[in-house]
């Protein structure tokens, strides 16, 4: 009977365990990954990785000119080894669906489609470069080729590449609508209808690569496989490096997962830019990326520059680079016509190479140079569009995060404006700045600890020779009356500071609203009523969300071993209401051995601790500061309203008084104005009379003149008449004389 109970009990446990596992699997397939939602700020760090990777790093080539981007690239390479981050981005890009579910449905997201377009354009560009080099080699060996056209392998490979390029150009011309859709898409657009076209687009680019280079084909065709392999390998290698990358990003899953693919495909063009001009200004959407990268710690924590980028990107609409796409298609037509004229021959018969027009290669090369330039412009437009899509996805991820949190707490879904969401995003950047600072301080303390207490080779060898099963002996506290050594004091102080950093970091990640939580190094002190300042004052509303942590571990263990081996106990508690920040850890000075060195270390640790506490207070008081600002702003508005009313009343009174004065002055001036008007009228009348008299005089004078003229004319007429009469009389006298003479 006892055995039967044991069997039934074990069977029951097996069934329960199987149900739990199947439930977890169903939850994963259905959708939301809590790690993604609770760590939405991880998206920011991919942005910085993608830009530095694209613009300042080329694999196996010249080192980047920007030292910040060089460090960022190294951090990003380590980041990609951790699969949870790349999976998180994959879930977000797929609308919070699991990777397996999205693979089964065969759906692709916008960023992946843009990535395929970039890959295709890059393969197209590589083919153009290879053809240009082939043409140059033919021109250099022109005399030899003229002698042996039929069996020249260089000429034959050139013709093959031209045919491949012609097929590429024809393919682009046939799929113009697909390119335009990709360029004009929005962040919420779905590509289910264009799935087959996208796959053919990607495979078309890789087919052209196979004819050109076998190795490049293998890299490009296995794009997704290589991504998965790179993400799976070395998952446990990035503990501190992951935190140092917690700044800004959204895309390494699409743009930096495959080093062999993206480094060669997206960054080859940028190497030439850096060789020509190291001071190139790159842009994040519309805002220069230097404004995001070249900032100090304080600006990075406030996150204003990056949020300006997000605001500007969210305000944008429509596609990018439409003119570049039109120029690309038009130039492609000309290239296709030139290639068609040159490659009319049948390549199956090598004797046809005799008719190969070598003289037309110069024109083809010039056209290829122009075509390549337009292709580069189009590629940069596509990359800018990809960046905008990623920033929009970041915004979408945060909206989903807020909705999920509201559902968990049983609250209605938030419906607020974009500006309020952007303010919340700033808080996420503050969290990331704190986490980044924590990681930097931890690495600094580790280096300091290793320099002060270097491990000897003999100790390491002795540890290796010991059996793994030998249990560790926990370090016991100092006995009464026994003073600890100086080295152990320094070691314990550094370990305590690192423990507090881990504590604050965990509180920020897991429970951002936790108030009055005492760090583990301070929880065992006598003064248990002390609280941590800078926490949220509204903790009474949800006391069930807050936990106190008690650590039990071996001092010689690392933090991971401490948590995994011994464990962490979480207990609910009522928040403490009174008290201030506890004093920071102080080093105990014992003996006379190198006191200056110990004091210097103590000062460094105290300064670091003060900076941490100040920034932590700035973070936690951010919302309170906003509330105070809003209250002051409202008070100013009320005061301004009161002042405006008073000033309006005073102005009305002054206006009335002025109008009365004006009316009185007008009335006083009225009679004077009448007299002046009458005088002016009299003067005008006198002037008119004088003018009339003058006119009459002139008229009389004119009449007299006319009369005189008439008299003169009459006199002239009379004189003329008299003269005529005299002449007539003379004529009568002359014939009489003549008659008298004749008679004689």
From Swiss-Prot:
Topology versus the membrane: Peripheral membrane protein
UniProt region (Disordered), positions on chain: 202-282, 459-487, 512-540, 666-744
Subcellular location: Cell membrane; Parasitophorous vacuole lumen; Secreted
Coiled-coil ranges (or none): 644-734
Post-translational modification: Not glycosylated.
Keyword Cell membrane: yes
Compositional bias annotation for Acidic residues: 226-274, 720-734
Main location class: membrane
Region (Interaction with MSP1 and host SLC4A1/Band 3): 77-235, 364-528
Biased composition (Low complexity): 512-521
Stretch forming the signal peptide: 1-23
Comp. bias (Polar residues): 211-224
Renumbered ranges of Sequence repeats: 226-231, 232-237, 238-243, 244-249, 250-255, 256-261, 262-267, 268-273
Biased composition (Basic and acidic residues): 459-473, 672-698, 706-719
Keyword match Ribonucleoprotein: no
Keywords for this protein: Cell membrane, Coiled coil, Membrane, Repeat, Secreted, Signal
Any one of the GO CC terms: nucleus
Region called 8 X 6 AA tandem repeats of [VT]-N-D-[ED]-[ED]-D, residue ranges: 226-273
Subunit field text: Forms a complex composed of MSP1, MSP6, MSP7, MSP9 and MSP3; within the complex, MSP6 and MSP9 mediate the binding to the host erythrocyte. Interacts with MSP1 subunits p19 and p42; the interaction is direct. Interacts with host SLC4A1/Band 3 protein (via the 5ABC region). MSP1 subunits p19 or p42, and MSP9 form a co-ligand complex that interacts with host SLC4A1/Band 3 protein.
Family annotation (PANTHER family): VACUOLAR PROTEIN SORTING-ASSOCIATED PROTEIN 72 HOMOLOG, YL-1 PROTEIN TRANSCRIPTION FACTOR-LIKE 1
Function: During the asexual blood stage, involved in the sialic acid-independent (SAID) merozoite invasion of host erythrocytes by binding to host SLC4A1/Band 3 protein on the surface of the host erythrocyte.
Family membership: Belongs to the plasmodium ABRA family.
Protein name as catalogued: Merozoite surface protein 9
Organism: Plasmodium falciparum (isolate 7G8)
Gene responsible for this protein: MSP9
